[in-house]
């Protein structure tokens, strides 16, 4: 579809990363594609004309700043995540895409020529993705795997350069700092509020609590109401087949509150730790 319209796209993560040796074999539940932000709407419209539908998303963009649009099709077993930016890369989307595009290459996959990130950029994408939840065993394992690969192939300088051109230095610091020579003298920038909140959101509800704490008093009441009584899109975004009858919604509200209350002690601990690190 993108080729027929002359729209620049490249595929991230997924089977291509496995073929490159950047990731251990795993089953992909969706397809991740990065599109030229200037032509995002054009690509989405073309997909909709071919039977793809936007997946419901939480309308609270303050808590969950959008970085992609997910579409699904009744005749396809997977979704497509159409990225127009990538969390951790703070450069303006259109400028960032140009830096990314010059670091892509073409491979043959499933009988098609596909554009994918070059090796260093592929590592950067995977590392940033894993750093969103670095305490999860699977993410920790992926970071260790990528670290060993980067050391073995001497990718640290290339990664440092890419992180600099995409303004990802602050986000990727925990991964990259261990790869650089101890003699390297470097001033690391501060991570954005969005990235700090994303990484700190370990427990159910923590992202909303953090967003409300950082919001202005003018919008706090509206955000609090949305957290207490979320719209149907919140449930459908997690499970597109969720029961939206009155009884079904009540069950989901009850389960949501139960998860939040169980996580409350850990949430308070994480908030205290975040406050201490910011002092």
Regions found by a protein language model. Give the residues of each.
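Conserved NTP-donor binding/palm subdomain of two-metal-ion nucleotidyltransferases/polymerases, i.e.
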Residues: 1-29, 35-279
């Amino acid at each position: 579809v993108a080729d027929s319209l002359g729209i620049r796209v490249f595929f991230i993560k997924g089977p291509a990363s496995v073929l490159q040796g950047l990731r251990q074999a795993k089953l992909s539940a969706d397809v991740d594609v990065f599109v030229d932000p200037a032509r995002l709407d054009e690509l989405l419209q073309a997909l909709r004309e071919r039977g793809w539908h936007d997946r419901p998303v939480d309308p609270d963009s303050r808590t969950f700043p959008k970085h992609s649009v997910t579409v699904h099709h009744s005749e396809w077993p997977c979704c497509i995540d159409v990225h127009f930016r990538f969390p951790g890369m703070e450069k303006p989307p259109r400028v960032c895409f140009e830096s990314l595009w010059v670091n892509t290459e073409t491979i043959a996959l499933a009988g098609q020529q596909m554009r994918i990130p070059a090796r260093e950029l592929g590592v950067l994408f995977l590392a940033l993705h894993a750093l969103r939840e670095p305490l999860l065993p699977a993410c920790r394992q992926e970071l260790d795997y990528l670290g060993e690969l980067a050391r073995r192939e001497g990718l640290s300088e290339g990664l440092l350069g890419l992180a600099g051109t995409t303004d990802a230095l602050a986000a990727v610091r925990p991964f990259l700092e261990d790869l650089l020579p101890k003699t390297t003298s470097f001033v690391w920038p501060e991570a954005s509020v969005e990235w700090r909140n994303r990484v700190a959101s370990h427990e159910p509800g923590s992202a909303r609590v953090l967003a409300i704490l950082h919001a202005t008093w003018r919008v706090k009441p509206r955000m609090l109401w949305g957290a207490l009584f979320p719209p149907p899109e919140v449930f459908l975004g997690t499970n597109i087949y969720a029961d939206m009858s009155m009884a079904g919604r009540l069950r989901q509200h009850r389960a949501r509150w139960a998860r939040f209350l169980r996580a409350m002690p850990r949430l308070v601990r994480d908030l205290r730790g975040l406050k201490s690190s910011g002092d």
